[in-house]
């Protein structure tokens, strides 16, 4: 743990005897943000040859911890999208999987399919889940992480199960447009998303 971002953060705060597990730190957003996407079994296709919470910062093409890259993108005002495969979000600690994603500045997740509870939790955090359709996926789109991705039409609002156009601009200048399925499945979920998440929805209905 002494080489991880979480370990470094806790060393700074003088708690080396109390590291314990992520589960014991679920109330500490600084720890949990740094732990999001940090599972040692994760292999980020943007950063080949690495395991765990690493990515490649663009346009510098620099391999670095995901959290550090997020901090840099926030400075630049760059919104983030996660691209995933099948059953995206499967695993334990599902609530923090969505909370951490939100805190890292992710606006949408585009995947081949979603684990049921995680899809719902993403919406509860105000994150838009989109699903690839028509046999399109990250591999046949040849995505490497340097692309600029725009989701067309969301500024005008979305509806459950809408088909939304995603525009992908490659470094070469090539532009591809694909259809995706909006995985906001119900009117209640739509209200949560429109309000920026379930907590904001509840607060606005209380005031």
Regions found by a protein language model. Give the residues of each.
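Fe-S-dependent hydro-lyases/dehydratases of central metabolism
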Residues: 8-207
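Single conserved hydrophobic/aromatic residue that forms the stacking wall/gate
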Residues: 1-7
């Amino acid at each position: 743990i002494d080489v991880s971002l979480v370990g470094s953060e806790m060393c700074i705060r003088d708690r080396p005897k109390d590291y314990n597990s992520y589960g014991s730190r679920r109330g500490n957003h600084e720890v949990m943000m740094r732990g999001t996407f940090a599972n040692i079994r994760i292999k980020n296709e943007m950063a080949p040859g690495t395991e765990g919470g690493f990515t490649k910062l663009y346009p510098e093409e620099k391999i670095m911890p995901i959290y550090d890259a997020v901090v840099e993108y926030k400075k630049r005002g760059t919104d983030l999208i996660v691209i995933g495969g099948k059953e995206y979000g499967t695993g334990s600690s599902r609530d923090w999987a969505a909370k951490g994603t939100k805190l890292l500045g992710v606006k949408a997740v585009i995947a081949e399919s979603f684990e049921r509870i995680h899809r719902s939790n993403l919406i509860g955090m105000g994150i838009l889940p989109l699903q690839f359709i028509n046999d399109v996926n990250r591999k046949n789109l040849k995505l490497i992480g340097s692309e600029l991705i725009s989701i067309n039409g969301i500024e005008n609002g979305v509806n459950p199960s809408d088909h939304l156009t995603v525009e992908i601009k490659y470094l070469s200048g090539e532009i591809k447009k694909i259809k995706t399925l909006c995985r906001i499945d119900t009117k209640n979920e739509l209200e949560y998303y429109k309000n920026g998440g379930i907590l904001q929805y509840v607060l606005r209905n209380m005031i």
